From Swiss-Prot:
NCBIfam families: PRK00228.1-4 (NF001268). Disulfide bonds: none annotated. Gene3D superfamilies: VC0467-like (3.40.1740.10). InterPro entries: AlgH-like. HAMAP family: UPF0301 (MF_00758). This is UPF0301 protein Nwi_2752. It comes from Nitrobacter winogradskyi (strain ATCC 25391 / DSM 10237 / CIP 104748 / NCIMB 11846 / Nb-255). One of its GO terms (cellular component) is cytosol. Belongs to the UPF0301 (AlgH) family.
Length: 221
């Protein structure tokens, strides 16, 4: 994870290398999907996104950016990352608060996989660094939030994602029209819930869809 002290959205690229600053997106435009969940349809051919549930952090005419919620980062452990980043000494790991000990690390997407993004509840905010996304949900991409979590002074709910999913202008809209994604409102239980394996099924049930009956239907709910 690359150390960063600046706010989210600076020095980012779409998957196709086009520039996008999420801090400049039209967050409150009703035509966009900020704060919504994307649920991959069976026709999704890209294995990186098969059966994925993605929280859309930013969406505008300039493109979209989101965090995959149900792809654990394998052997990557949050406490080990704190040690690697010199936020805490290994000998002090025993002193970590429960919120840090249980912090989930996700594969947030295929773009900038060496950079960390913390999706969290809105009870924590850093001026000029935290991006409010939707009611109760924010995104912060600086080391300051990791330091706060390690001290027990961070947000009540949070997940750390390595990398993100990015779409060029109009790309996400096209994928939805091609039945690649369903989208629906998000809730904190789905975003921060610890039952990672069941998030895909739970997201579908949230909008009344039986996964066994899912086919190439319309891409919204």
């Amino acid at each position: 994870m690359k150390p960063a002290r600046k706010g989210p959205g600076r020095d980012r690229r779409h998957a196709d290398d086009a520039d996008m600053d999420i801090a400049d997106t039209d967050t409150y435009d009703r035509n966009y999907l900020d704060g919504q969940l994307l649920i991959a349809m069976p026709v999704m051919e890209d294995e990186r996104f098969a059966r994925s549930v993605i929280y859309v952090c930013a969406h505008s005419s300039e493109g979209a950016m989101g965090i995959i919620l149900n792809r654990p980062a394998g052997s990557v452990d949050f406490s080990d990352l704190l040690v690697q980043l010199d936020i805490i000494k290994r000998a002090d790991l025993i002193k970590l608060p429960e919120t840090a000990e249980t912090m989930k690390v996700m594969k947030g997407g295929p773009v900038e996989t060496g950079r960390g993004f913390v999706l969290h509840s809105s009870d924590f905010f850093i001026e000029d660094a935290t991006l409010p996304i939707d009611e109760g949900i924010c995104l912060t991409a600086t080391l300051d939030i990791l330091e706060a979590i390690a001290k027990g002074a961070g947000p009540k709910h949070a997940i750390l994602a390595l990398g993100y999913a990015g779409w060029a202008p109009g790309q996400l809209e096209t994928e939805i029209q091609d039945n690649g994604w369903l989208h629906c409102p998000a809730d904190q239980d789905l975003i921060f819930g610890r039952d990672i394996e069941d998030k895909y099924v739970r997201a579908l049930h949230k909008i009344g869809i039986d996964p066994g009956m899912l086919s190439n239907e319309a891409g919204h709910a």
